[in-house]
Curated annotation (Swiss-Prot):
Gene name in the database record: hisH
Gene3D superfamilies: 3.40.50.880
GO CC, any one term: cytoplasm
UniProt GO BP: L-histidine biosynthetic process
Top-level taxon in the UniProt lineage: Bacteria
Catalyses which reaction(s): 5-[(5-phospho-1-deoxy-D-ribulos-1-ylimino)methylamino]-1-(5-phospho-beta-D-ribosyl)imidazole-4-carboxamide + L-glutamine = D-erythro-1-(imidazol-4-yl)glycerol 3-phosphate + 5-amino-1-(5-phospho-beta-D-ribosyl)imidazole-4-carboxamide + L-glutamate + H(+); L-glutamine + H2O = L-glutamate + NH4(+)
Record SUPFAM superfamilies: Class I glutamine amidotransferase-like (SSF52317)
Function in brief: IGPS catalyzes the conversion of PRFAR and glutamine to IGP, AICAR and glutamate. The HisH subunit catalyzes the hydrolysis of glutamine to glutamate and ammonia as part of the synthesis of IGP and AICAR. The resulting ammonia molecule is channeled to the active site of HisF.
Protein name per the record: Imidazole glycerol phosphate synthase subunit HisH
GO terms for MF: glutaminase activity; imidazoleglycerol-phosphate synthase activity; lyase activity
Amino acid sequence: MIAVINYGAGNLPNVVRALQRVGAKLTITDDPHVIRSAHAVVLPGVGATADTMASLQQLGIADVLPEVIAAGTPFLGICVGMQVLLSASEEFGPHPCLDIVRGTVRRLPDSAGKIPQIGWNQLRIMPNFSDHPLFVGIPNGADVYFVHSYYCDVIEETIVAARTEYGIAFPSVIIRDRLAAVQFHPEKSGDYGLRLLANFVAWSNASPARG
């Protein structure tokens, strides 16, 4: 069973519908015990990292996520669900995040043009990730849908699975062991978004049982 975390994120219903469309067996929950025992975890998100962190902390989920990821539970973070994984964010003033992935959430550069980036843009899949199970059926250069003003400036270059150009070549997908996170919205990204979600479901089902 995939636990889709409900902390009040506005895109939760769309993420749930998209996962159900690709056949995922899921539960919508804000219960740390359910999240801890889930076969896989999805953290959706829109809005600001500070608000998201406050909600996760209030629900007792902020302490659980590092545990389940360290235990090898397949995890997918979406948009702000990706950003809160980092060490800190500069959005509305510096503040700490979950510190699961080393790095800082920074504002897209003014040279990008209109901020936030809203609309379709391409995934440039890194060569060493081109055969990863999450990218099955997703070509290099696939168009996906973004809505964001901030990006993840990660320290570990080796976990960057795809980049997207918008004033800067920012990480649009990161993968480390059984952790994956995407800056774009797969639930709004048409066939390629659904394919990525289906790939995540298959990837999580293929994961070895946790000991």
